[in-house]
Curated annotation (Swiss-Prot):
Reaction catalyzed: RNA(n) + a ribonucleoside 5'-triphosphate = RNA(n+1) + diphosphate
Record's function text: Promotes RNA polymerase assembly. Latches the N- and C-terminal regions of the beta' subunit thereby facilitating its interaction with the beta and alpha subunits.
Record's keyword terms, sorted: DNA-directed RNA polymerase, Nucleotidyltransferase, Transcription, Transferase
Full protein name: DNA-directed RNA polymerase subunit omega
Residue ranges of the TM segments: none
A GO term for molecular function: DNA binding
EC numbers on record: 2.7.7.6
EC top class named in words: transferase
Subunit structure: The RNAP catalytic core consists of 2 alpha, 1 beta, 1 beta' and 1 omega subunit. When a sigma factor is associated with the core the holoenzyme is formed, which can initiate transcription.
Lineage: Bacteria, Pseudomonadati, Pseudomonadota, Gammaproteobacteria, Moraxellales
Amino acid sequence: MARVTVEDCLHAVDNRFELVLVASKRAHQLAKGVSEPLVEVNNDKPTVLALREIAAGLVTKDILNQPDHHFATNSLDLALSGGQGF
């Protein structure tokens, strides 16, 4: 897919504002390595991957009901956070 538009994604998420929340949460998961991409990467950035996953129907607004993960998983993150997570 050469370009992803908002209209490509609106069949999976009803409104544009919710789409922003879904895409940003999924992009954050991808950027932090919480989960693997569900589409071919093609050298795309996490935000583009998130939108492509939404457009393909692989990610829905149900992602908003998932608990946020604390990303202090490596020793540097733990040291910087004082061992308490973020």
